[in-house]
């Protein structure tokens, strides 16, 4: 947790004006919230792994679940954010999520610089002929302008 957490917090300090300080009031509170969440996860990890609640996996490889196993799948702060992974990676990862989920939600739809993801239009165009695709506004906004999510779901 040490150095990566310090690096992230330093980047946050340098970009404080890019954030909405409503739900979380300041950097100290943000750091406390994040570290508390990390400690909670780590305290549960070994038992959760033994109980198969945590399963190691790398998208876009095939998930170890049957088609349509889940009602909703969520990609949080990963897909569409890391455009360096490339268009094909994102299409394959989303396709695999849609194989096991009736609906997926991707949040946020901005890149690491809080700009609209370069590939959002291409991803929407790719999936919209086979799935219901929409961008929904959310009440949650931490990065300024970052209050939208992409929803892709199977037609019923």
Task: Give the ranges of each region predicted by the language model.
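A short, conserved alpha-helix within the catalytic core of class I
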Residues: 82-96
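Class I S-adenosyl-L-methionine
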Residues: 112-156
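A short acidic, Gly/Pro-enriched loop at the edge of an enzyme's catalytic core
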Residues: 60-74
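Conserved beta-strand signature within the Rossmann-like core of class I S-adenosyl-L-methionine
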Residues: 93, 97-110
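Hydrophobic/aromatic beta-strand patches that form the interior of the parallel beta-sheet core
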Residues: 55-57, 105, 134
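Conserved SAM-binding strand-loop segment of SAM-dependent methyltransferases
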Residues: 50-64
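Residues lining the SAM
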Residues: 76-79
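Class I S-adenosyl-L-methionine-dependent methyltransferase module
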Residues: 1-53
